[in-house]
Amino acid sequence: DFDGWAEGLKLGRSYCGDGLSHVLDFKVNDVAVGEPGSAGKISTLALTQPGKVNVRFDVAALLQEKQTDETRRIRNARLDQKPYWHIERCRIGETRRVPVEVIVNGEVAWRKEIEADGSVSTLNVPLEIKESSWVAVRILPSVHTNPVWVTVGDQPVRASKRSAEWCIKAVEQCWSQKGKGIRSAERATAKQAYDEAKSIYERILSETTRN
């Protein structure tokens, strides 16, 4: 059912990965990623005040039991060399274990090592949510989920000044590289769109207190 698959992708019911690790059935409390949550909002759990939530997911990863010359090459390659994402880069020392992390607002909030033998583990992680946050699961750099948004007191997520500043610079850089290639008849409209994007990130920056 291609239409159903495309709709799920649009709603965020997916994750990014190299195919050698997987995170399935990711939920925060009873809200699943890519599914309607509080007040019907996709991937959103609304809390009236700070409190504890439960993060639940199934996770599996597969590493060769013993390293080879090729897997060592992958593991030791620079991050700007292919393959950029590969489970071998996650191997802990000479073991067959990899780290699973729960991320809150871009920071590691919880970490556990699992055996990367292909078996599926069901994990439940209690977390204290102090402010509106996005929550995701990863084995980096092998798999990363889309986020579940947890709002507190109906406040927006304002995770990081550095992130907002990076986005502003990214918009500016993109325009400096792409703007000259846009047809003159369309350039003013395009510039307006870029300026609007930049203004959104500037507003987010002004509302953010955390670095």
Indicate where each model-derived feature is located:
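C-terminal functional module detector
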Residues: D1-N211
